């Protein structure tokens, strides 16, 4: 009986310690690893658009933009625009060179953003137009 009395609190203590240790914030990606670790699928909001972005290991990217709002979200009336191009990272700056755009008006063919924060699952960027956007890593585009 006494052993059982001690096992339960000990088990709860172990569960509590494991739970607290798993609540640590994710470690930031070192700047020297940005180009390798940024490869993958990302989802975020840019202005009034939902944006999914795939950054490939060969330096190519594809971004899909869809307007947000009642009509777009409920009746699927919003057209999804697609932008393709190449990306590079130099220090904390990611540069996108656009090679094609479908159903999307592109002002500039080259744009750069500063990486404000980057961990395994989240990426915060500040555009050269001074807008901040946060993207979350996803499993699929």
Predicted regions and their residues:
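Sec-dependent bacterial lipoprotein signal peptides
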Residues: 1-21
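Lipid interaction determinants
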Residues: 23-141
